[in-house]
């Protein structure tokens, strides 16, 4: 990911297993919070947008267009964060976005992960639509943990034991 140091410049940093683990730990907490708040606060229009994005995600899986898949996945999460109605949470998540984006593609390119992601998103939307706060929180956390597990498997199946 890109690191900017004032008066020193910008460079692309190597990302370690520890960095990945830390990013996913933070993201699991933040997405869990956002999903729970969204279950309480989402509008019908936002819910409709999430459902439309799920359909688009499936269509792009069929064509194998990874650029569009990542674009739709990012839009899905953005709607979820906006639906939380918590500007500070959204700001914190946006600060992580560049780091998440730099590793997301690798996780999503793992065999079967795209379909798993679509199913996990569907489950999350179902809980949000039902206004099930706890279900939404659990689904969001599970989705992020599954993405982390897949990423670690894609890096090296022998190093993944659930903890780094």
Regions flagged by a language model, labelled:
Residues 33-62, 71:
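Amphipathic alpha-helical dimerization/coiled-coil segments
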